[in-house]
Amino acid sequence: MSQFGTTDIVSGSETPPYSGASYQDAQDDNTHPHSSDAGAEKFSAGSGSESHTESSRSDDEDSQAKTKMVDNITILKYILDSLSGRDKLAKIIKYALDILKLFIEKSKRNLTVLDPSVLTYYTKILKNLTVKVALRHPITVIKVLLLSLLRNFDKKIDFISQQLSTFRYILRFGGTPFRVCSFLGKFNKTRKCNFQIDQIKKIWFNEASLREFLDLYYGIFDELDLLYKLKIWTNKSFYSFVSRQESLAWQYDILLSLKDHWLNLQSLQKRQLELEVQLKVQNNALLLSPILMHQAHKDDGSQSPIRKQLLNDLNVNNDAEVLIHKQLKAIKDEKTLVYLDIARLSFDCMANTSDILNLKTPKGTYAVLSLGSGLTGLVKLWITTKRSLCSSKD
């Protein structure tokens, strides 16, 4: 079998990861800290600049204190308690062992190529190893023992890797019946609307239905793959078909998820630019406020209502500016998660593409790419878990 059986589905079929705070959350939640540079360049000429800077620094210190309250052991415990966390850790260990196995195989080849006599005396020395033989041929004995150790270690690594792969399949097992029920619900809705074209388009012709179909398609073949590993069925020709369809379904899901994350990134960048422009306008207005206030004292009686309202707005507290900083901080955090998702999906896409197209790649390419995917996924899960724990302590 190729490496089809070692893949894992992303997005829909994974256990949903912790979700990070989006920038919309910052509009309603005043507990999120704003960025560390907030207030550093603000309003040196305004009357509220010093108090705002002190408030910003105080919020940052509180945020750092809350973050330090969550130690790494607690975060690791929460990750291990989640299905997604166990899957990520198992994936990292499996492909790290696969890479280690490649180094062991290379070491064995180098050992036998440099000294072919090692293979000649391999069995003889292991059967008749005595102190006398070890003293007469110390170098050869050391090489034989090293080769024996590497061979045994190689077999153990291969066994552990296979068990971890099966463990990850078991973690994903059992979701197909629920996906089938979801599709039956859609069929019932279609039947109740008397198969009207507009309603059919609304129910079926959308991205959510496409993703549900891909999840169901992948889940069926993924669970059939596990049943084959457990020897529930043993048809090898059908298993080749199952492995192929499993990888194709995963590839479709990867591409769809990449598209969604790319559009999400563009939306976040657009919103970030809008907030930065808005913040710059407010900063410029506050820099002009001392001049306007000075002029207002001179001709207080001749002010128009609009000018009075403008001066009043400039003299109020900096809640709007603080809120913008919170939203910018939330967007920055959200973009970090999106970048990690894009990196993870890119690793998965390259690994799965090399497998589907049977590309001639250097040995270990699939394992290295899959390890990169697992590490980026774990980093994202670590960040979101830490944020979740910090927010729960507020």
UniProtKB/Swiss-Prot annotation:
It holds the Pfam family PEX11. It is found in: Peroxisome membrane. Residues 1-366 are cytoplasmic. Residues 1-25 have a biased composition (Polar residues). Keywords: Membrane, Peroxisome, Peroxisome biogenesis, Phosphoprotein, Transmembrane, Transmembrane helix. The chain crosses the membrane at residues 367-383. Residues 51-65 have a biased composition (Basic and acidic residues). Residues 1-65 are annotated as: Disordered. The modification Phosphoserine is found at residues 58, 63, 289. The keyword DNA-binding does not apply. GO terms for cellular component: peroxisomal membrane; peroxisome. PANTHER family: PEROXIN 11, PEROXISOMAL BIOGENESIS FACTOR 11. Present with 2420 molecules/cell in log phase SD medium. Required for regulation of peroxisome size and maintenance. Has a role in the import of peroxisomal matrix proteins. Imports RHO1 into the peroxisome. Also promotes peroxisome division and biogenesis. Homooligomer. Interacts with PEX27 and PEX34. This is Peroxisomal membrane protein PEX25.
